[in-house]
Amino acid sequence: MNRGRGGFRGGRGGRTGPSQFQQGPPDTVLEMGAFMQACEGDIVCRSINVKIPYFNAPIYLENKTQIGKVDEILGPLNEVFFTIKPSEGVKADSFKEGDKFFIGPDKLLPLERFLPKPKEVGPKPKRKSGGAGGASRGGFGGRGGARGGFGGRGGARGGFGGRGGSRGGFSGGRGGSRGGFGGRGGSRGGFGGSRGGRGGRF
């Protein structure tokens, strides 16, 4: 996993938390998101938690019934959205707008983990001369990486990312806003697009 400027590269399959083999629900759960709409079988949520969920973190109802796992994290750092891949037998369109989903407190990361670190005050270390193929701009990877958020695999810098084209989202076309969260390749476009199409407009 490569971490870009204050974020992760890779809209999916990132960190899953310290315990990948947890059995049963946690002792307590915290509010994580509110249902917005179903999109191609997934649940699209607006985050109502100040922290960022782990990828693949289990998501529960208030009664601790697991309904799926975090699939993708999207949007700018000050307005985070995420999708849930429903568990077998759970229908994304069975929920209504405003329904809340919950997460275990051990599956959250502080937002500060994804913000740029302050510049160090003091003399700069001397660079060694010579050598081919040095690190670029601090050695944080190339195009498609995150700048202040989650960057997608070959996707946009921030903004909303998707899987090979429009899949319903908020911003379309190439790129998106810097300092956000992206998915896998391409742009997730405006909510209500079809996979492989062009992204929507604001």
Curated annotation (Swiss-Prot):
Matches recorded under Pfam families: Gar1 (PF04410)
Single GO molecular function: box H/ACA snoRNA binding
Biased composition (Gly residues): 1-16, 130-202
Record Gene3D superfamilies: Probable tRNA pseudouridine synthase domain
Residue spans of biased composition, Basic and acidic residues class: 114-123
Disordered, as annotated region: 1-26, 113-202
Highest rank taxon of the organism: Eukaryota
Cellular location(s): Nucleus, Nucleolus
InterPro entries hit by this protein: Gar1/Naf1_Cbf5-bd_sf (IPR038664), H/ACA_rnp_Gar1/Naf1 (IPR007504), Transl_B-barrel_sf (IPR009000)
Primary localization: nucleus
Region feature (RGG-box 2): 137-200
GO cellular component: box H/ACA snoRNP complex
Region spans: RGG-box 1: 5-17
Listed GO biological process terms: snoRNA guided rRNA pseudouridine synthesis
Annotated family: Belongs to the GAR1 family.
Subunit structure: Component of the small nucleolar ribonucleoprotein particles containing H/ACA-type snoRNAs (H/ACA snoRNPs).
Name this polypeptide is given: H/ACA ribonucleoprotein complex subunit GAR1
Organism: Scheffersomyces stipitis (strain ATCC 58785 / CBS 6054 / NBRC 10063 / NRRL Y-11545)
